[in-house]
């Protein structure tokens, strides 16, 4: 006998790097657990219409612009669930209208919350390791496994081993050889790998879903239109100014790399943001911002003081 199926619209509401979370009552399915806002898609509703309605009814705010995030299928013992996920940033003017008991949590705090099993893949996508190693040499991916590990994250039961290790951005212009090399990686290494969209689009679909994130250069970001980001995979934008940072927000990116913060040997002639300008940009972001340029792994606390979520580096990582 087949299980009943339920289609649910789920909203990931973002503000200054935090995510809105609520609590499921004991009498609800999967009760006494945390939840993201949302609810059942009614007959005649599209998923995004249901998302918009549920957020107005449950949270108390009306948001029109939503970005498709993913569709997740999960089977419980008694029911088959399809989660249609969307994400949106919340304007500061709406904060006072948000109804209790909805609460803002940092990405790190999400790891310690008790969510239904169907939400675990959402948590893994929302949480980013705080370090990104950048290299043109893919062989460094394996050597970099234990060089920088978020010690706190390793203690979290909801975080798998790969997520607890630094991410690795394979930066290369050699597309053909890059595609061949990436296809030789195992799933563990793919789960830490960030590659540019030009490489990613040439991979088989199974490998496209396995990578940690898809990278877009600033010009690629500026050339995109709303709705063109791929579904079901994290996307990270390279930004060098406020215009591109704001563009990344409007397009629905998951995170950004903001650079250069300090002078670097690889880009000696580039205009450096400096910490104060970086802080101004990062503090205005609702997405995780990685600081890049002249930083070492030990600079994480400094970068976070100026509004960064994490740091990225080349020669010093």
Name these PLM-found stretches:
Residues 1-20, 71:
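Conserved N-terminal beta-strand and adjoining loop/helix that marks the start
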Residues 18-58, 192-194:
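Conserved Nudix-box catalytic region and its N-terminal flanking loop in Nudix hydrolases
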Residues 134-137, 146-158, 163-246, 257-259:
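Catalytic beta/alpha-barrel core
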Residues 270-278:
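Charged helix-capping and loop-helix junction motifs
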Residues 72-96:
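Active-site-adjacent beta-strand/loop module that shapes the phosphate/pyrophosphate-binding cleft
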Residues 195-210, 240-251, 284-290, 295-313:
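Catalytic cores of alpha/beta
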Residues 87, 95-127:
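NUDIX/MutT-family hydrolases
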Residues 218-224, 257-269, 295-317:
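Glycine-rich phosphate-binding active-site loops on the catalytic face of alpha/beta enzymes
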């Amino acid at each position: 006998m087949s299980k009943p199926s339920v289609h649910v619209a789920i909203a990931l509401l973002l503000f200054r790097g935090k995510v809105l979370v609520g609590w499921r009552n004991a009498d609800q399915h999967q009760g006494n657990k945390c939840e993201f806002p949302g609810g059942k898609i009614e007959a005649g509703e599209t998923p995004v219409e249901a998302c918009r309605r549920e957020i107005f009814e449950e949270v108390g705010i009306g948001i029109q612009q939503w970005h498709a995030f993913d569709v997740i299928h999960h089977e419980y013992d008694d029911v088959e669930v399809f989660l249609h996920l969307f994400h949106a940033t919340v304007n500061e003017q709406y904060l006072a209208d948000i109804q209790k008991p909805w609460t803002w949590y940092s990405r790190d705090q999400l790891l310690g919350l008790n969510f239904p099993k169907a939400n675990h893949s959402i948590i893994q996508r929302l949480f980013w390791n705080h370090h990104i190693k950048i290299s043109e040499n893919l062989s460094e991916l394996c050597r970099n496994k234990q060089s920088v590990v978020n010690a706190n994250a390793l203690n979290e039961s909801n975080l798998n081993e790969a997520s607890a290790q630094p991410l690795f951005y394979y930066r290369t212009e050699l597309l053909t050889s890059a595609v061949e090399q990436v296809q030789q990686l195992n799933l563990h290494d793919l789960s830490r790998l960030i590659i540019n969209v030009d490489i990613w689009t040439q991979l088989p679909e199974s490998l496209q879903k396995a990578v940690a994130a898809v990278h877009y250069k600033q010009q690629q970001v500026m050339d995109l239109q709303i709705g063109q980001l791929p579904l079901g995979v994290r996307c990270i934008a390279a930004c060098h100014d406020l215009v591109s940072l704001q563009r990344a927000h409007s397009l629905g990116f998951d995170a950004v790399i903001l650079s250069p913060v300090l002078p670097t040997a690889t880009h000696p002639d580039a205009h450096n943001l400096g910490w104060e300008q970086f802080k101004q940009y990062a503090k205005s972001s609702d997405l995780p911002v990685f600081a890049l340029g002249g930083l070492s792994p030990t600079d994480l606390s400094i970068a976070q003081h100026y509004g960064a979520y994490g740091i990225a580096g080349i020669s010093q990582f």
